[in-house]
Every structure is written in structure tokens, then in C-alpha cells.
């Protein structure tokens, strides 16, 4: 089976899902990840305007599968301070799951939430409350809780915190995990020198079978920086060797591996996606990281 690897791609204009599939195919990808609209607002097109059938036909023709949706950043079900933010998060997440199912994706990646000053324990309680509200309807979609870097008041930057959330949710068979390499590195896990040790720890605390998506990113920061700044493959503190090992790890062979690395180019007008090169690099078809 060919390596299940792709990147974040856009979905906009008239073509919508077809455009996403065309972009992914142009990178030589076998999978991809999308937002169903702008990640910073709630404006969304109707499901019938997402051009799903044409998108699916193009995907089938070009060997693209196991696509992933990312929930927008504006969802924060960990917010204990503003009931309206929590309510918006729950309602919007519910509608995003509906759209995810319509598109044919099985995983929607979610940043668990930020406690905005109330403390991790209170934030986690709120996240559990929100997920219990969202996961009442029967849908063929799992929410993939993302491993976070620990920036600001983020919850879910340790495996123990994610385990607490999962244990508190009634229908937790509908929860999975998105393992982000930059975030786990920035949170303090030594994925560079001891990835198997980190995976064993994850397995002991959560269960490795919960990992259903992997975000492949290098990091601009040293381990434990709690910063969350993605870097291009081979240009950061994780490095190509460690990321190559993770991408080709047996545990992840049937799991979509998604690049979210920064666009490259000397100035703002010249920015372009690095994904065609980075996918080939991680397929071991190229030897050198992309020139920035």
C-alpha cells in the first residue's frame, strides 16, 4: 500500500471539494485535510454547495482517500468564563460533524479547548460537558482530539489530560486522537531521540489504537518550549530523520499523515506551498529538505 500522506489544502470558490482534491493530486498526495470554511469564522456554504459528488469522483480517480476535516479555531468548548462562547462551540461543532459526514470523512480534528484562566481542571470539565452534548447523535464520524503544545491556557498538552477528557465522555468510542509532532515536541515529549518510548507512554495512558490522524510538522522551537510554531520538514528542531521515522512507523501505516508546514518564499507576495517537495521527501524520493 502506498504511503498515506498529504497536506492541508484549501476548499473555496465554486469547485469546493473538487478544488481540494485537485490541489492534493497536484502535490502527489494520497490523502488531504480541509476546513469546511474559513477557520476563524462561522460562515459556511450549504452542504449541497460543497460540490461533494464531483470531489469524490476526482478523489477516486486519483487515489485519494481517508480525508480529514479540521474543526475551526473559533470553537472553544473549554471556555468556563463565557457561556456564549461555549454554546457557540457546541452548536457549531455539531454542524461541522454533519458536514464532515456529508463529505465522507471519518475524522474531524479538534483542538480540545483553552480554560482561559480557570485552570486546566475546570477547562477539562467543561470540555467533557461540551463533548457529551455534541456526541448524542449517531454519526459515522469520530472527533480526533489533537495533542496540544501547551501554549497559553490550552488543555490537552499532556497525554494524562487527554485521557481525562476521554474517560469523562460517555460515548468515548466516538473519540480518537490526532498526534501532532510539533505540538508533542513543544509540550516536552522527546520524539526526536525516543519516539518509541513516547508512543509506549501514549499507549499506556490512552491506548495507541486511538491515534487516527497524524500531523507531520517540524518545530521552530526547542523541546518543551510550549510555543506551537510549525517549521518546514528538516528545517526545525525535530529534523528529517525523526519525522521520516514517524511517517514510516508501523503503528501509523493505515493512518492519514498530514503536513501543516508553512508556505515558503522570500517575501509575502512570493509565498508558495512546500507540499509537493515535502511529500516526495517523506516518500524517500528526494534526499534534501526544500530550500526556503
From Swiss-Prot:
One Pfam match: AP_endonuc_2
Protein residues bound to Zn(2+) 1: 70, 111, 146
Positions of Zn(2+) 3 binding: 183, 228, 230
Cofactor(s) in the UniProt record: Zn(2+)
Catalytic activity from the UniProt record: Endonucleolytic cleavage to 5'-phosphooligonucleotide end-products
Keyword annotations from UniProtKB, A to Z: DNA damage, DNA repair, Endonuclease, Hydrolase, Metal-binding, Nuclease, Zinc
Enzyme class (EC, first level): hydrolase
Membrane-crossing residue ranges in chain numbering: none
Record: residues binding Zn(2+) 2: 146, 180, 215, 260
EC number: 3.1.21.2
Cofactor note: Binds 3 Zn(2+) ions.
Main function: Endonuclease IV plays a role in DNA repair. It cleaves phosphodiester bonds at apurinic or apyrimidinic (AP) sites, generating a 3'-hydroxyl group and a 5'-terminal sugar phosphate.
HAMAP family: Nfo
Family stated for the protein in its record: Belongs to the AP endonuclease 2 family.
PANTHER family: APURINIC-APYRIMIDINIC ENDONUCLEASE, ENDONUCLEASE IV ENDODEOXYRIBONUCLEASE IV
Protein name in the entry: Probable endonuclease 4
Amino acid at each position: 500500500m502506498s504511503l498515506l500522506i498529504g497536506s492541508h489544502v484549501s476548499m473555496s470558490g465554486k469547485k469546493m471539494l473538487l478544488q481540494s482534491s485537485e490541489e492534493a493530486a497536484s502535490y502527489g498526495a494520497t490523502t488531504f485535510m480541509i476546513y469546511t470554511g474559513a477557520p476563524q469564522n462561522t460562515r459556511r456554504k450549504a452542504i449541497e454547495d460543497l460540490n461533494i459528488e464531483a470531489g469524490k469522483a476526482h478523489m477516486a480517480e486519483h487515489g485519494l482517500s481517508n480525508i480529514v476535516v479540521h474543526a475551526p479555531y473559533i470553537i472553544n468548548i473549554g471556555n468556563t468564563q463565557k457561556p456564549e462562547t461555549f454554546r457557540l462551540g457546541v452548536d457549531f461543532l455539531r454542524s461541522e460533524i454533519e458536514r464532515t459526514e456529508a463529505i465522507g470523512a471519518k475524522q474531524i480534528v479538534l483542538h480540545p479547548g483553552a480554560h482561559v484562566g480557570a485552570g486546566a481542571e475546570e477547562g477539562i470539565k467543561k470540555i467533557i460537558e461540551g463533548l457529551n452534548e455534541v456526541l448524542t447523535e449517531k454519526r459515522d464520524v469520530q472527533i480526533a482530539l489533537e495533542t496540544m503544545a501547551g501554549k497559553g491556557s490550552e488543555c490537552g498538552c499532556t497525554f494524562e489530560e487527554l485521557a481525562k477528557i476521554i474517560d469523562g465522555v460517555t460515548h468515548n468510542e466516538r473519540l480518537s486522537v490526532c498526534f501532532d509532532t510539533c505540538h508533542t515536541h513543544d509540550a516536552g515529549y522527546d520524539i526526536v531521540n525516543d519516539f518509541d518510548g513516547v508512543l509506549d507512554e501514549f499507549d499506556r495512558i490512552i491506548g495507541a489504537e486511538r491515534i487516527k490522524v497524524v500531523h507531520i510538522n517540524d518545530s521552530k522551537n526547542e523541546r518543551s518550549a510550549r510555543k506551537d510554531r510549525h517549521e518546514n520538514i528538516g528545517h526545525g528542531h525535530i529534523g528529517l530523520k525523526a519525522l521520516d521515522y514517524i511517517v514510516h512507523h508501523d503503528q501509523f501505516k493505515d493512518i492519514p499523515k498530514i503536513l501543516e508546514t508553512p508556505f515558503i518564499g522570500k517575501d509575502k507576495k512570493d509565498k508558495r506551498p512546500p507540499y509537493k517537495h515535502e511529500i516526495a521527501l517523506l516518500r524517500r524520493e528526494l534526499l534534501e529538505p526544500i530550500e526556503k
